[in-house]
């Protein structure tokens, strides 16, 4: 008799995706972040669901409802901080996952890569709207500043902003719709994840060498299920350490002050994971130019498959490209630091140079470097 795992219509799909899936034998810990992102999404959906049971999306009671969750709801404080710090973990895993894709040339699977970019945009949108919900000072002013950027769009900009706000300023209508979108988007993300995996399983996983590994595959279970389980354990340990010992480490103290439209905070800045994009936005004095640069800072990932000029897929055996990759990482860390600094000398010029370097590396330096490496190999 055939095993139910291989014959049952539903079990068969799970079996082909998680159990009998042929996987390369040499994928390293950098390949753990896909499953860790799945875990993060699960944690966010579950904690978010419990928070939504107690939260009220009204400007008069939103801040109080979050306080009520932390003080009066059973274990509400841990649910709230798991959700807030879970977002930070989500982005840490996302950045490492994308970084691994760039380093090992996984972007050559263009369908999987493009769905991944869509996922990145969706997660960023969800996180932004979630940050508005507690209705603290940074929530309100962050929402005002970022939504206002759309007014830079020629002709329809102002109407578009007022349509999104549901009025002439960020108010009750804005908060209600942001809550609705923040609730539905994670489920859209989960659906996109399925498409992402569907495309990935069409081609099979890449591996550190970038060489086709069809000749040397091993079953996903037990080898990579055990490896993923260890990753889960480490991620949960890190998240719980953050939540139980220093829950406000990555937050902004201004968000513990209720939103006040009459009082602007001295430094309006987003959560740490958006600071690099915020620094790129601020580095261009023109409003429309800044908005375009902001969108392009993520959208530029879509041109990476087109700019792959190397004869080798992975950077594993390309030392010059490796150097440029780590310069890119250092540049993004610099942009993250600049995004949190006030707009004054010398931070303005550092931000402009770092932004210029970011686009130059991806569009010019890395493809040129790949061509030089091809020449060095006499190909």
UniProtKB/Swiss-Prot annotation:
A ubiquinone binds at residue 201. GO terms for cellular component: mitochondrial inner membrane; respiratory chain complex III. The keyword Electron transport applies. InterPro entries: Cyt_b/b6_C (IPR005798), Cyt_b/b6_C_sf (IPR036150), Cyt_b/b6_N (IPR005797), Cytb/b6-like_sf (IPR027387), Cytochrome_b (IPR030689), Cytochrome_b_C_euk/bac (IPR048260), Cytochrome_b_N_euk/bac (IPR048259), Di-haem_cyt_TM (IPR016174). PROSITE patterns: CYTB_CTER, CYTB_NTER. The chain crosses the membrane at residues 33-53, 77-98, 113-133, 178-198, 226-246, 288-308, 320-340, 347-367. SUPFAM superfamilies: a domain/subunit of cytochrome bc1 complex (Ubiquinol-cytochrome c reductase) (SSF81648), Transmembrane di-heme cytochromes (SSF81342). Heme b b562 binds at residues 83, 182. It is found in: Mitochondrion inner membrane. Component of the ubiquinol-cytochrome c reductase complex (complex III or cytochrome b-c1 complex) that is part of the mitochondrial respiratory chain. The b-c1 complex mediates electron transfer from ubiquinol to cytochrome c. Contributes to the generation of a proton gradient across the mitochondrial membrane that is then used for ATP synthesis. Heme 1 (or BL or b562) is low-potential and absorbs at about 562 nm, and heme 2 (or BH or b566) is high-potential and absorbs at about 566 nm. The cytochrome bc1 complex contains 11 subunits: 3 respiratory subunits (MT-CYB, CYC1 and UQCRFS1), 2 core proteins (UQCRC1 and UQCRC2) and 6 low-molecular weight proteins (UQCRH/QCR6, UQCRB/QCR7, UQCRQ/QCR8, UQCR10/QCR9, UQCR11/QCR10 and a cleavage product of UQCRFS1). This cytochrome bc1 complex then forms a dimer. Belongs to the cytochrome b family. This is Cytochrome b. It comes from Ochotona curzoniae (Black-lipped pika).
